[in-house]
Amino acid sequence: MEKTVISVKVRQNSIEVSGHAGAAPRGQSVPCAGVSGMTWMLAKGLKEIVDLPGFGLSIADGHVTMHWDQLTQSAEDLIDAWFLGLCDIAEEYGCIEFI
């Protein structure tokens, strides 16, 4: 199976995650499941726990975009924790490209 990359773009007012790790057939990839679960948790946390002003979410096959007006400290803390988890997955599986 050809290995591809999950791309992660973190900007001041947005996060974009796209791609597939290619570590296993679609739906069976441990790194993809980890990134997907962590990213979904981040989106739910920013929307429902932090209630981040101007938060928006767009989901398509293999692509998630989140955007907001201005970060709060609570939102930054959630994003930092999410990012640390992604770094662990990247180190273990080598399938995440941070842009």
Predicted regions and their residues:
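N-terminal intrinsically disordered, cationic/polar leader segments
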Residues: 1-30, 37-99
